[in-house]
């Protein structure tokens, strides 16, 4: 199926799901507005007890209707999002390379994430899993979505302030973004990580300084094999990571890991890619931007191939 065909089908599905949600946020806003006007009239014109009773009945009716409508909207949103991923996103990925496979669920495991040691351990799920072979390299690309942590409900204002600070710290520290994993026909003897210099990334341990001054300003390098690290982190590859670091787009703070004969690239992002939004206009230009995101991540493999060719010599 072409992307244009998928676009038409998805747009029709969006209309169908909006209709199932019975008018949606616009209708809800209208009803709430009518109720607010009635309440204002009661206050301004002092309409008395009878009108107050009618207002109270209207309030409970509106409350009941809103709760039932919320369920309808959630159901319609989930149905549309599932269709969006299975039809539109699958066609979008297929247009990049028809041999690539896409699944709305799956990706990096918890053990792999923790083994990299770049970010602190957190509970997450992986989604939007793209797999394939690019320029002779087997890869997988996915999104990591951190689960919300639980916080106690407290009455003490000082404890509440601390909990609020903890919430803000966790929001910033827990990784959310994209992970690219590549498998090369090359054994790595040690573990090498190049960590973006950010507050929420690894900073403890012996650091290795390389010849690229700009790279040293942007990244912290930790390795168990100093000689291998210099073969892997070639000037061109360091330049590629510097370029990714400088990008002012949705992908930020790239960090890389060479371990267990695999390469991992972590890019922090608050944006959730490949999501169908029921009450937003379906935009083909937005789809093209998400294609560019995939191609941008895969472009790292080109520099990696050159690095490993030099290493094999």
Over which residues does each language-model region extend?
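Juxtamembrane membrane-interface segments of multi-pass membrane proteins
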Residues: 1-8, 80-96
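Cytosolic juxtamembrane N-terminal segments of multi-pass membrane proteins
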Residues: 1-24
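Canonical alpha-helical transmembrane segments of integral membrane proteins
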Residues: 23-43, 59
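Hydrophobic alpha-helical transmembrane segments
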Residues: 42-60
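Residue-level recognition of short, structured coil/turn motifs
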Residues: 46, 97-98
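Transmembrane-cytosolic junction motif
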Residues: 61-88
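Charged, low-complexity intrinsically disordered regions
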Residues: 90, 94-96, 103-154, 166-313
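Central helical "cap/lid" subdomain
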Residues: 157-162
